[in-house]
């Protein structure tokens, strides 16, 4: 079913639906913008580029949201707590990027299912997993993993478009492991010059990590600017486990993302 096309924005190349302008379609700021469509890769990219994301329970129509206000976090201002830094320094954990995307999104889905056991509902349905896995294959969706030896103990996933990152979900199996994954993401985005990371909806956990609230209009204006900037290549750091405590030295993330690091990987 085509999405409503009232107050249309310019349609990005390859998008099969015309999404409505969130500001015009939802002047009261309730957040719900449209129903219907599909979860094809081009549809998802078009939605995110226009400040919307899918959020619905399995068996319900696909619902597209653009909440007002919007929850974001500034990577350049993020400061890990002393407790988290101590945990990162002493735990002996490693981190990776895009080494176990399927396992991360499945773990996030399980976490949501357990949290909502009374309703047996989770918004990370099999259809959503399939859709974001397809985006991962297109190098749009990324995962951050935290490891204790060979055990995956925490992680998160989201989308990278231009110089914008859209966080989707995180999980932990060991205390502080999801915070460690968030720390890695903040380091990545800060050293990639991302102005902010979209966290979608505020919650106490994100606010404790330093998230802020933006009016939707301000978020959409900033998003347009971030999407216009060239995407930073993260391939030099993908697919390998690296010592997490090394990121306490901020210069190392700059090195990991450098052309020199990428060239050394190609020579291995």
Regions found by a protein language model. Name each.
Residues 1-268:
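N-acyltransferase acceptor-side catalytic subdomain
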């Amino acid at each position: 079913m085509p999405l409503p096309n009232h107050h249309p924005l310019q349609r990005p190349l390859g998008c099969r639906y015309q999404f409505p302008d969130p500001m015009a379609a939802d002047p009261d700021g309730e957040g719900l913008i449209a129903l219907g469509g599909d979860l094809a890769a081009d549809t998802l990219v078009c939605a995110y580029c226009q400040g919307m994301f899918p959020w619905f329970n399995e068996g319900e129509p696909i619902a597209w949201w653009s909440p007002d206000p919007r929850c974001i976090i500034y990577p350049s201002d993020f400061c890990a707590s002393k407790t988290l830094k101590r945990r990162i320094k002493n735990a002996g954990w490693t981190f990776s990027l895009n080494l176990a995307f399927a396992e991360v999104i499945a773990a996030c889905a399980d976490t949501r299912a357990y949290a909502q056991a009374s309703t047996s509902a989770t918004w990370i349905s099999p259809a959503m997993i399939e859709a974001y896995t397809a985006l991962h294959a297109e190098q749009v969706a990324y995962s951050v993993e935290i490891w204790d030896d060979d055990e995956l103990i925490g992680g998160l996933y989201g989308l990278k478009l231009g110089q914008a990152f859209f966080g989707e979900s995180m999980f932990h199996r060991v205390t502080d492991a999801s915070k460690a994954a968030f720390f890695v993401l903040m380091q990545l985005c800060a050293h990639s010059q991302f102005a902010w990371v979209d966290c979608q909806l505020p919650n106490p956990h994100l606010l404790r990590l330093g998230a802020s609230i933006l009016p939707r209009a301000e978020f959409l204006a900033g998003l347009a600017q971030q999407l216009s900037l060239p995407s930073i290549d993260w391939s030099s750091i993908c697919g390998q486990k690296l010592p997490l405590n090394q990121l306490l030295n901020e210069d190392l993330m700059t090195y990991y993302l450098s052309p020199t690091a990428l060239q050394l990987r190609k020579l291995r």
